[in-house]
Each structure stands twice: as C-alpha cells, then as structure tokens.
Amino acid sequence: MVSAVEPKTYFLPRQDLAKLLDRLHDGGRQVIGPTIRDGAVMLDPIERVDQLPVGWGIDNAPGKARLVEQHGSRVFDQPPGPSSWKRWTYPPRLTEFAWTDAAETDAAPAPRRPKPVPAKMAPQAFLGVRACEIAALRVQDKVLLEGPVVDRDYAARRRDNLIVAVECAVAGGTCFCTSMGTGPEVRGDFDLALSELDDGFVVRVGTDAGRAALEGLTLPAATSDQTAAAAASVARVRAQMGEPLPMDGLPDRLMAAAESPRWAKIAERCLACTNCTLVCPTCFCTSISQRSDLDGDGASAERTWDSCFTLDFARVAGGNFRTRVEDRYRQWLTHKFGTWWPQFGSSGCVGCGRCIAWCPVGIDVREELLAVAPPVAPAADPPPIAPVAPMPSIVPSALTLPTPTAEGPRPMPWRTVEVLDRRRETRDVITLSLGTDDPGLLAGRPGQFVMAALPAVAAPPISVSRFHPDGLELTIRAAGPATAAIVNLERGDTVALRGPLGRGWPVELAEGRDVMVITGGIGLAPLRPLLDHMLARRDRIAHIHLAYGARTPGDRLYVDELDRLAASGVIDVAQTVDRAGPEWLGRVGVVTQVIDRIMCSCDRTIAFVCGPERMMRATVDVLHERGIPDERIWVTLERHMDCGVGLCGHCQLGRYFVCKDGPVFSLAELGPAFAVEGL
C-alpha cells in the first residue's frame, strides 16, 4: 500500500483486459484472481484472461452456491466464492519456526533453539477484490499488524500486494455488506478499481502503483455516461440487498444474551463442521503442530488454520471449556459481532455472506442475530425517514505496513536456558531451576508466564513459580506429552523459553492492605512470586493470609517452605486437604471453609485467587459474602494458548485474550463472563 493519488477515471475496452493482465505480471508479480475450479469460483494464480470466469454467475442462498452459465462476456458477475484473499496473505499452512543449533563453543555443545522461518514468495497482484474483501483485509491488518506483536510473515505478504478492486454488479442471496457498512461501493484502499460494463471497464486509479500498472495502455478517459452507468450498477446492487440489519447496540445486545435458549436451538442444526470459519475472510485462529524428521535431526513448528468450532479448540490439561456445540457457536457469533469491537475497534464481519452460503445446513447469521439479540423498540416515535445514503464504514482505516527493517513489536525471541536443578514436589509435579543471564527473562513480574519449547512437542504456557537474580523456576505438572517431556528434563539439559508474557499480579495494590492469597493444588505456583514480592516488602503490607487447599497431604507444593513460613509467623498460613489418612493432623475440607476463619479488615482487604475455575467461583461467592468487592478480587485464568501474544485466538474469554490481556484479571474487569459456563 502507498499513498493515494488524485483520482483519475479511464475506460478499459474489454479486449484490452489481456493487456492489463500482462502489465500486472510485470516485475515477476504473481497475479491471483477468480477462476473456475472444483465447481466453484476460486482464487488461484491467473496467467491468461481465458482462465477468468467469463460468462459464469453464482446462484447462492443459505446452504447453497451453484455455478450458473450466463453465456455472456462479463468476467466479474458473481458474488464472492468460498476462497478469500486470506489464503494468500495468511496461508492455511506454513512453517512458523525450525529448530537450529546455536553458536557452538569449545566449552559446551551448541544448544538447539527455535528460529523463525522468513516468508518466501513473489510479489502479488490481487485481481477482482470486492469492497467487502478490502474491508476484510483492513480488519486482518488491524489484528495482525497492530496488535502487541506484528505477524512478520503476514506483513511481508501484505507489503507486496497490488490491489485491483472490482465493484459488485450483482448481489448474491447471502450478501449483506450494506448492513456492515463495507460495500458494495469500493471507497478506498485500492491501487486500481474496475466497474464492469457490457463493453469494458471503468477504471479508477487509487495509487501511483496503480497508475504505473496502466502505463503503455493509452486508455481514454471514461465518459460521463460510462461513469453514470457504473454508479447505477452499484446502486442496483445496494437496492437488491434490501433493508440493512439493525446494527445499533448489537454488541451489547449479544453479550446480554449470553445465556439465551436460542443458542441450544442453533446447536440442534449446527454440525460444528468449521465451514463458516474456513471461508471467512477475517477469522485468524490458528494452531501450532510440531513436526520431526524420522532421524531426529530436524524439527519444526507448523502453523495451520484452526476453528473455534473444533472440539479441542478450548481444551486445557484440566478439561475443556467448550464441550457443547452451542457454546462454540455462541463464541463464534459473539466474537464476530460483539467482542471484536473492544478488541480491534470494528466488527469482525464484513457481510460477504460466505458463512451463510457455505453452511451445509443453511444457518443464516442474519436470522440468528435477530433471534438472539432482537433490536430494542424505540421509546419514542422515530424521526422521519431520511433519504437513503451509504452507511459509514465500520472497519478501521488503511494501515501503514511495516517495512522489512522496521523496528516495532514482534514476537519475543526464543532463549535457550539450562536446567540447573530438578526437585520433585509431588508424585506428578516437578520444579525445574533454570539458569539464564538474559535480562528479558529475568525482568518478569509475579503472575507472568513463559512458553516452553522442546523439539517435536508442543510449546505449553507455564507460569513462573520463582524469579532469581540468575534464573527462574518453573513448577510443572505432567498433564500431557509436552509437559511430560519438560518434566523429564535432567540437570544439564536445555529448554527454549519465550517470555515472560501476559499481565501479572497488581502487586502495588497490596501495599497498605490486608491480603488474602487463596489457592488450590498447583495453583500455588503462579502465586509464589507474589508471596516472594510481598515478603521482600513485608513492612508495606498489613496482614498476609495464605489459604491453601490440596486433594491430599501428598499433593501439597513447597511443603517445607510453607512450614517455615507458618512457623515464622510472618504470614498466616492455613492449609487444608480434601481427604487424608490418620497421619494428617491438619484441616480436612475445602479451601472456602478456611476463608471463613481468616480474621481481617475486609473493608481494606485485597484477594488474589488461583485454582480450578469452579473452586475460584466458589471462593468469589465467599469473598462477596464477606463484603470484598469485585475491584479487589483478582484471579488468574487458565486457557489453551498456542502463541502467548493474542494471535492464535484459542484463549479468548469474552472481550479478552487471556494470554495478552491477562492471565490476571480483576472480577470487575471480567464481569458476567467469569460466571458463564462455556464462554
């Protein structure tokens, strides 16, 4: 993308379209455009004009998209097909990083660490980009270029795009871009824009790159009749789509309907087949899979498109947050039309209608939005109806793409650290002491986490359980193949870390207050750095109460450490177990029963809570009974994470990505989302 130039309008005779195609190929550029493949209009590399869908249309409706031969000479008389430009800017499959040997020294063998794999592709021209699809590119730019990190592969691919837009001449039965304010008019962010007439194309120039693509074609200026005919064609398309959906207040209406019975009704039809997310031009969720050579010498991580409709999308070691189809459909619809707004400043839907046409059971999001979140009747008589005018765009404006050498937010590099010590905490929990002098790793805050990677296994998120001047500790339960591999590391082994990531505990809010630290099982690990921080500043904290629950006495973490703290009297330590034998002389019961015995001034108490979410919800109920408000109750959440920086989409909870906006939140921030099952 480059700066726009003064608009100029030309006319391209139909027989000269081949010449324009040749110009688009100049400089080794690959041209991507619509063509007929597998019984549909797909986006593929185009070498010749006869590969374009000349004389073909599409008859589409909910659950239906059929090619229709029109026996004419028009090229772009179809609504969008199932493939989108996302396939070329954000490929369905690519190698994210490969394991390489670090610099070897005489003193030690070279440790292995992940290294990003740069994008390799020719510059591209996109021919036939609709207005809604330009909006989709803007939306993806916002997600992948303006987040906490820049997706370097996406940035490289977008930087070399030449956009040849096409204004729609027909509206499909599933199109609703007028409702989303994204079309059918092509308003900007193009290099060239074509409006197809029977004998040729009205051509608008949007950038210097677009003007350069027309050099040598000696095109005449478009006549007033030609420009009027082009405008009338787009106006007919707008009229064909009918009355726009009532979008005012939709995000709030959707979130207020989180427990509507309509979700279960939709789930009776929804197959959770993922078609809607795969054809969507803005969905960005991905998963990382590990690949390993048979000889063990090579390993890499492959990023693939994923979908919030898959069963394992929200699975973590302790269970699955969205087992029901209704929860997965709710996640998709509320994200697209609701929580995308606070996350990225726009809707996640551009109204292309692909999800409706390519749903095998014909679920129509337009109908479901009206059923789940009907518009609120106005309190007074509405004002007189004004003349129809184009709806304002609800997508972000064009973005300046980073140059290859631009400094800016990017994923943290992987750092190789050495295992200095290995300590068993319980039968299935190990604490690893890791040595490093990397200032980034050592600068973490209590409550942050790292991504830990070994060749050929997934890189799980792991909370830091202690920071040292010369390293850090990770306390890990062997809950799956990845954590089992990390737990089995021995002294002298190495592991790659990226981080620390996320938002930690608000330690500054504890000063001058009574503090309750309430946790269960391995949930003590992310709270341990918080305890370290408060103990180092003990004179600034009023009272510190630790309530710790475990399944059995043998499942407690840091036993000797907690016993020393309890004996010192520096903090009040209360431990309880769910069940125990006669050798256990302590409390038996759930941790919420311990909270009732804590003596504190609740009008100045702050609570930090970590554990299974059902345990945390029960704890919150008890804290509320004691008068502690949501603003002073802080929790840390567990969610599936493949990236740690808000790009994979797995960890979404309402308006938040747990990895980058959390994992620590106050109850006031989470609001009702904390209590809704399956969200």
PLM region spans:
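Ferredoxin-type iron-sulfur electron-transfer modules in oxidoreductases and energy-metabolism complexes
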Residues: 247-268, 286-382, 623-626, 667, ...
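A broadly conserved sequence feature marking short terminus-proximal activation segments
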Residues: 225-250, 278, 294-325, 575, ...
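Short, flexible loop segments at boundaries between secondary-structure elements
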Residues: 154-169, 551, 629-650
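FNR/FR-type flavoprotein reductase catalytic core
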Residues: 481-642
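Local cysteine-cluster metal-coordination motifs and their immediate loop/turn environment
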Residues: 130-135, 268-287, 303-316, 345-362, ...
